[in-house]
């Protein structure tokens, strides 16, 4: 056991039994790094992060790796939801040096906390090779790492001066955005698709044009009908691993859901529609159902259960075939878009096709929920984050106004 056993954070407690001598971020431990002249390994993640859990199991439980880290580094673990300020600093570093980032965010710092390297997920052998190289460089030629860090800081300062002097303006011109947006599947062009609620909010309030309206409709359609939405329990997953929005990365984050409730509600309010009321209602009901005893909304729901990533959400093809009748199976195939892109290893991930037969809907949904009820529900991180709860309160108010539901307000 290490000192993380005393952590309030569920994410940090997951690492309490690691053989690594993980420390909290504190003035005392940072002073120790300077006194002992040791590099710092800073590892940042959060409770719902699938790859954080994988690296914890594969890499941070490894005795050989732990011994090397304990002897040669100061090892610090951070929950990004507890220290968004620190996470922001080192996420900026990886974005500036590599162009992309994510979690787990694993950094190597000089004893004075200046970064010299940042990466994300590493298998055990790759991680050991990486930290061994940096240990050797720092031992034999520390000036090389110090110079690199100094150059990065100078570059960052110059970049900030440029940003302050530039007069960039947000443009509503479709032509200027066209190279960044996906006209085939909606959203921002990327191999992975994030809902990007702030971008959606920006689009909603743009002057109406046929091109923008068509793009917004396509984006909202795929966000509410494809794999990023959970049509049984309600709620949105964090992102999809493919550009077509078919298969999600299965954690649910409060801040995403809160903002998407606002986006969909405001879209309907502006357009004088009730197009997304069922999605909004189901999502609100889901988050209310898992609200903590102290009346706060939890920060996230894990991607994993005992069956692995998305284990709670996947439906085995043979199990569905036994539970549903032939007619129910035919209906489910249409209603939940059960086709080849959503089938992996004889397991379905269901979508939210708005094709609904009232007579069959309740029966089929109830049976599918029963299948889920026999699985362990993913871990809920009951950490109450004030700003995210405020986002949800805003979402409830927006929904209440848009759909004239006083219970939400």
Predicted features and spans:
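Replace the tail clause
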Residues: 1-402
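Short, intrinsically disordered, charge-balanced linker/junction segments flanking boundaries
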Residues: 405-409
């Amino acid at each position: 056991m290490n000192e993380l056993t005393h952590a309030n954070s569920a994410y940090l407690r997951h690492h309490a039994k690691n053989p690594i001598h993980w420390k909290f971020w504190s003035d005392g431990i940072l002073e120790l790094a300077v006194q002992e002249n040791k590099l710092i390994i800073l590892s940042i993640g959060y409770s719902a992060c699938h790859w954080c859990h994988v690296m914890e199991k594969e890499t941070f439980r490894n005795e050989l790796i732990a011994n090397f880290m304990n002897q040669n580094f100061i090892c610090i673990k951070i929950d990004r939801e507890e220290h968004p300020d620190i996470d922001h600093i080192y996420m900026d570093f990886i974005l500036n040096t590599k162009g992309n980032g994510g979690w787990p965010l694993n950094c190597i710092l000089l004893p004075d906390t200046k970064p010299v390297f940042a990466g994300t997920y590493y298998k055990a052998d790759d991680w050991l090779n990486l930290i061994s190289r940096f240990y050797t460089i720092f031992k034999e030629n520390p000036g090389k790492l110090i110079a690199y860090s100094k150059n990065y800081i100078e570059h960052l300062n110059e970049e900030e001066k440029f940003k302050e002097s530039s007069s960039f303006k947000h443009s509503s011109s479709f032509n200027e955005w066209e190279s960044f947006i996906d006209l085939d599947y909606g959203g921002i062009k990327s191999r992975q698709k994030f809902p990007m609620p702030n971008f959606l909010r920006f689009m909603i309030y743009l002057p109406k044009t046929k091109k923008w309206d068509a793009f917004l409709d396509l984006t909202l359609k795929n966000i509410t009908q494809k794999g990023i939405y959970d049509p049984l329990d309600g709620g949105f997953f964090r992102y999809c691993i493919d550009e077509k929005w078919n298969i999600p990365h299965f954690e649910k984050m409060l801040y995403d859901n809160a903002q998407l409730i606002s986006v969909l509600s405001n879209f309907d309010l502006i357009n004088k529609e009730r197009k997304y009321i069922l999605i909004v209602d189901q999502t609100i009901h889901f988050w209310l159902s898992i609200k903590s005893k102290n009346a706060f909304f939890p920060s996230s729901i894990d991607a994993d259960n005992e069956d692995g990533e998305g284990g709670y959400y996947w439906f085995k093809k043979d199990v569905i075939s036994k539970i549903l009748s032939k007619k129910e199976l035919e209906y489910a195939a249409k209603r939940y878009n059960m086709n080849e892109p959503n089938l992996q290893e004889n397991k379905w991930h269901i979508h939210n096709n708005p094709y609904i037969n009232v007579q069959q809907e309740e029966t089929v949904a109830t049976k599918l929920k029963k299948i889920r009820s026999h699985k362990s529900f993913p871990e809920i991180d009951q950490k109450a984050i004030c700003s995210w709860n405020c986002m949800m309160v805003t979402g409830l108010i927006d929904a209440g106004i848009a759909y004239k539901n006083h219970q939400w307000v």
